[in-house]
Design a protein with these regions (language model features):
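N-terminal secretory signal peptides that target proteins for export/translocation
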Residues: 1-3
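Bacterial N-terminal signal peptides
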Residues: 6-18
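An amphipathic, aromatic/His-enriched active-site/gating alpha helix that lines ligand/cofactor pockets
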Residues: 23-26, 47-65, 77, 86-127
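Surface-exposed interaction/gating patches
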Residues: 25-46, 52, 56, 130-137
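Solvent-exposed beta-strand motifs enriched in subsets of small alpha/beta binding domains
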Residues: 34, 83-85
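Solvent-exposed loop/turn segments at secondary-structure junctions
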Residues: 70-74, 88-92, 131-133
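A short, glycine/Asx- and small/polar-enriched loop/turn
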Residues: 75-81
Length: 137
């Protein structure tokens, strides 16, 4: 029994880690973002994206993949925006967000859209690397 266990342990140790996780090779990364709107303010969040934010993202090299709203109450229907951005690399994402935050147009749009209070109360971000079998690369 011991030789079999030793064989299994050796096999597991020799498996390349790349089989289990996509490498961070500087290639494209996707950013999954979820915004929770202040109560009753999702229409304001959507309008800000539709009318301003997407164009500002584009100007800073942030590629929009898609935008969605949950359809089930348990997932935040009526109060959340979920979207995905594509960045050339993690470093490019960091740079783009830094530039976006100080963009004069963004600052004006943000201030104007929040004249009656904050419209986003929670922001979540997850960076994702495509697997070797992903249609998005």
């Amino acid at each position: 029994m011991l030789p079999f266990r030793t064989f299994l342990l050796a096999l597991v140790c020799l498996l390349p880690l790349g089989v289990f996780a996509a490498p961070d090779d500087g290639g494209p990364v996707y950013e999954l973002r979820t915004y929770t709107a202040a109560p009753g303010r999702l229409p304001d969040v959507l309008a800000r994206f539709r009318d301003h934010t997407i164009a500002i993202f584009k100007r800073h090299g942030m590629e929009s993949v898609g935008y969605w709203v949950p359809t089930d109450a348990k997932d935040g229907a009526g109060g959340k925006l979920v979207y995905i951005l594509r960045h050339p690399s993690r470093e490019a994402a960091k740079k783009a967000w830094a530039e976006f935050r100080v963009d004069p147009e963004w600052q004006a749009v943000s201030k104007a859209s929040e004249a009656n209070g904050k419209i986003v109360v929670k922001t979540e971000s997850v960076f994702l690397a495509p697997t070797d079998f992903s249609m998005l690369k």
